[in-house]
Swiss-Prot record:
It is an enzyme of class 3 (hydrolase). This is Crossover junction endodeoxyribonuclease RuvC. The active site is at D16, E75, D147. Binds 2 Mg(2+) ion per subunit. The RuvA-RuvB-RuvC complex processes Holliday junction (HJ) DNA during genetic recombination and DNA repair. Endonuclease that resolves HJ intermediates. Cleaves cruciform DNA by making single-stranded nicks across the HJ at symmetrical positions within the homologous arms, yielding a 5'-phosphate and a 3'-hydroxyl group; requires a central core of homology in the junction. The consensus cleavage sequence is 5'-(A/T)TT(C/G)-3'. Cleavage occurs on the 3'-side of the TT dinucleotide at the point of strand exchange. Homodimer which binds Holliday junction (HJ) DNA. The HJ becomes 2-fold symmetrical on binding to RuvC with unstacked arms; it has a different conformation from HJ DNA in complex with RuvA. In the full resolvosome a probable DNA-RuvA(4)-RuvB(12)-RuvC(2) complex forms which resolves the HJ. The gene is ruvC. Mg(2+) 2 binds at E75. PROSITE patterns: RUVC (PS01321). It catalyses: Endonucleolytic cleavage at a junction such as a reciprocal single-stranded crossover between two homologous DNA duplexes (Holliday junction). GO terms for biological process: DNA recombination; DNA repair. It is found in: Cytoplasm. Keywords: Cytoplasm, DNA damage, DNA recombination, DNA repair, DNA-binding, Endonuclease, Hydrolase, Magnesium, Metal-binding, Nuclease.
Length: 185
């Protein structure tokens, strides 16, 4: 009879904030291995900004309740040519971060360059390259949607020890989850 060894897995929720569509991706990190758990999008309807921000906040809380992550990785805002778009994206990002922090999760931030470098090996990679590498790294049958792929890429970046900023947005740390795996010996 083989004995079982205990492996501690860390569940990471990656978020790619957007006012219309916020991508989410959930992975488990077991040692050096990554395992896909889930991904999808939180969509807001056209309408008043406060209602859309509430949809994002509630959506993140629902994802956290469904998948119980230990940590959260969020892509930082890039400065757009259009200042109004940048402000709206910043507000959406704030709602997403508040959703995670209100669930007592530590939030780590990464630039798009850091995420692409960690996943593709090139900081200026195209979205299609990110999608393809996410599919390969997580052994997915098909390519995830661009928003979900970006969120999964953010989670992968964090899992690979990306140098995100956890300072001001850190909630209380959660312990990893315990999984039992058969002893290979």
């Amino acid at each position: 009879m083989k004995s079982a060894s205990t492996v501690v897995a860390t569940r990471i929720l990656g978020l790619d904030p957007g006012l219309r569509i916020t991508g989410f991706g959930v992975i488990d990190k077991l040692g050096n291995q990554l395992r896909y758990v889930a991904s999808g999008c939180i969509r807001t309807r056209d309408g008043e900004l406060p209602g859309r921000l509430k949809t994002l906040l509630d959506g993140v809380r629902e994802v956290v309740a469904a998948y119980t992550p230990d940590q959260v990785a969020v892509e930082k805002v890039f400065v757009n040519v259009n200042p109004q778009s940048t402000l709206l994206l910043g507000q959406a990002r704030g709602a997403v971060i508040c959703g995670a922090v209100s669930c007592d999760l530590p939030v780590h931030e990464y630039t798009a360059l850091q995420v692409k470098q960690a996943v593709v090996g090139y900081g200026k990679a195209a979205k299609e390259q990110v999608q393809h590498m996410v599919q390969r790294l997580l052994a997915l049958d098909g390519c995830p949607s661009p928003d979900a792929a970006d969120a999964l890429a953010c989670a992968i970046c964090h899992a690979h020890g990306g140098q995100g900023t956890a300072g001001a947005f850190a909630g209380r740390r959660r312990a990893g989850r315990i999984l039992v795996a058969p002893d290979p010996g």
